[in-house]
């Protein structure tokens, strides 16, 4: 099992997901979205399972200006904006092979 948790160190839901796996003795790999982010392929595979691009975006996030920019950007440019600003993605993203979940 190769479990990956994409999130930020400050996110409470990401901390809950990490604690879930630690308590059960399950090994996982943590990827900090602020430092590394997700590749286009990783993002697309997770988005496919979780409701597409708009399902991956945390519309209740703090940066309302950036969210408005993404909302009104042309569809072909939205993906690039989201990948440039990974803090707008719902966290945690937990991946295990092709299966993935969003949020805790």
Question: Where do the protein language model's features map onto the residues?
Answer:
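Local sequence-structure signature of Cys/Sec-based thiol-disulfide redox active-site neighborhoods
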Residues: 1-33
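Thiol/selenol-based redox catalytic cores and closely related redox-interacting motifs
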Residues: 33-104
């Amino acid at each position: 099992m190769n479990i990956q948790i994409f999130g930020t160190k400050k996110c409470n839901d990401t901390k809950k997901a990490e604690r879930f796996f630690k308590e059960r003795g399950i090994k996982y790999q943590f990827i900090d979205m602020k430092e590394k982010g997700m590749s286009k392929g990783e993002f697309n595979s997770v988005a496919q399972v979780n409701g597409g691009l708009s399902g991956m975006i945390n519309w209740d996030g703090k940066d309302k200006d950036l969210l408005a920019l993404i909302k009104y950007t042309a569809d072909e440019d939205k993906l690039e904006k989201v990948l440039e600003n990974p803090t707008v993605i719902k966290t945690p993203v937990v991946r295990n092979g092709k299966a993935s979940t969003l949020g805790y």
